């Protein structure tokens, strides 16, 4: 029933939440995808940021709602509510920081606690431009993804490497989630309009 009528329906919306430790490049990946740019000045995300982009696929057009979460411990209590109605969780680590890689297991566990198996999870090893400082091999990333039954890709937000491919692969996986999306579409529209009151810090509403 959900096939065939796509073009007559309002634009389908899918919520992607970006998770991972501080400074792994979550904001940079979103900025590269949204604006094809990279800011060398690091600025920590304060609370939760939200951006939206229309993506044109071969068979339909979708709107991706990109939720950028803070990696700092003090904001962790906010994150489960954003995971709860997500269609996709993008869990990012820094290939030059083995601890950020080890912590992805916890982030993926958090996603599954909130969403069960009813979610697409993409594990992303970012900062391949710093290959000389690599602490996590691509084989280790692939192995963890296989063990945890998630998708995997390596990227460089700085160089633009594989960023479009990351979103293409996520988009290609979306049709299997249509029933979930239909069920949560109204909630997602409400959330989009809220711009969460949970943001605890008044300054720094934008940390792109």
Swiss-Prot record:
Modification N-acetylserine occurs at: 2
Regulation of activity: Regulated by guanine nucleotide exchange factors (GEFs) which promote the exchange of bound GDP for free GTP. Regulated by GTPase activating proteins (GAPs) which increase the GTP hydrolysis activity. Inhibited by GDP dissociation inhibitors (GDIs).
Modified residues (Phosphoserine): 184
GO terms for MF: GTP binding; GTPase activity; myosin V binding; protein domain specific binding
Amino acids binding GTP: 23-28, 39-40, 42, 45, 71, 126-127, 129, 156-158
Keywords noted in UniProt: Acetylation, Cytoplasmic vesicle, ER-Golgi transport, Golgi apparatus, GTP-binding, Host-virus interaction, Hydrolase, Lipoprotein, Membrane, Methylation, Nucleotide-binding, Phosphoprotein, Prenylation, Protein transport, Transport
Cofactor entry: Mg(2+)
Recorded consequence of changing residue 46 to E: Loss of RAB6IP1-binding
Tissue: Ubiquitous.
SMART domains, per database record: RAB, RAN, RAS, RHO
Xref: InterPro entries: P-loop_NTPase, Rab, Small_GTP-bd, Small_GTPase
Sites of S-geranylgeranyl cysteine lipidation: 206, 208
Cysteine methyl ester: modified positions: 208
Enzyme class of the recorded protein, top EC level: hydrolase
Role this protein plays: The small GTPases Rab are key regulators of intracellular membrane trafficking, from the formation of transport vesicles to their fusion with membranes. Rabs cycle between an inactive GDP-bound form and an active GTP-bound form that is able to recruit to membranes different sets of downstream effectors directly responsible for vesicle formation, movement, tethering and fusion. RAB6A acts as a regulator of COPI-independent retrograde transport from the Golgi apparatus towards the endoplasmic reticulum (ER). Has a low GTPase activity. Recruits VPS13B to the Golgi membrane.
NCBIfam families: small_GTP
Free-text note regarding domains: Switch 1, switch 2 and the interswitch regions are characteristic of Rab GTPases and mediate the interactions with Rab downstream effectors. The switch regions undergo conformational changes upon nucleotide binding which drives interaction with specific sets of effector proteins, with most effectors only binding to GTP-bound Rab.
Subunit and partners: Interacts with BICDL1; leads to its accumulation in the pericentrosomal region. Interacts with SCYL1BP1. Interacts with VSP52. Interacts with RABGAP1. Interacts with GCC2 (via its GRIP domain). Interacts with RAB6IP1 (via its RUN 1 domain). Interacts with TMF1. Interacts with CIMAP3. Interacts (GTP-bound) with APBA1/MINT1 isoform 2, also called Mint1_826, but not with isoform 1. Interacts with RIC1; the interaction is direct with a preference for RAB6A-GDP. Interacts with RGP1; the interaction is direct with a preference for RAB6A-GDP.
The protein's name in its UniProt record: Ras-related protein Rab-6A
Organism encoding this protein: Homo sapiens
Classification lineage: Eukaryota, Metazoa, Chordata, Craniata, Vertebrata
């Amino acid at each position: 029933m959900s096939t065939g009528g796509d073009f007559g329906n309002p634009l389908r919306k899918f919520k992607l939440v970006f998770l991972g430790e501080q400074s792994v490049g979550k904001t940079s990946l979103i900025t590269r995808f949204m604006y094809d740019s990279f800011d060398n000045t690091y600025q920590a995300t304060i609370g939760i940021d939200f951006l939206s982009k229309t993506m044109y696929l071969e068979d339909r057009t979708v709107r991706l709602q990109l939720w950028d979460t803070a990696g700092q411990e003090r904001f962790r209590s906010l994150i489960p509510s954003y995971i709860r109605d997500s269609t996709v969780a993008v869990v990012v680590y820094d290939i030059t920081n083995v601890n950020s890689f080890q912590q992805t297991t916890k982030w993926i566990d958090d996603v599954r606690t909130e969403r069960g198996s009813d979610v697409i999870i993409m594990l992303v090893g970012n900062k391949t431009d710093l290959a000389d400082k690599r602490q996590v091999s691509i084989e280790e990333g692939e192995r963890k993804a296989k063990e945890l039954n998630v998708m995997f890709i390596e990227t460089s937000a700085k160089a633009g490497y594989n960023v479009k491919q990351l979103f293409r692969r996520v988009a290609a996986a979306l049709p299997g989630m249509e029933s979930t999306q239909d069920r949560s579409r109204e909630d997602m529209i409400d959330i989009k309009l809220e711009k969460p009151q949970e943001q605890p810090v008044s300054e720094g509403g934008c940390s792109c």
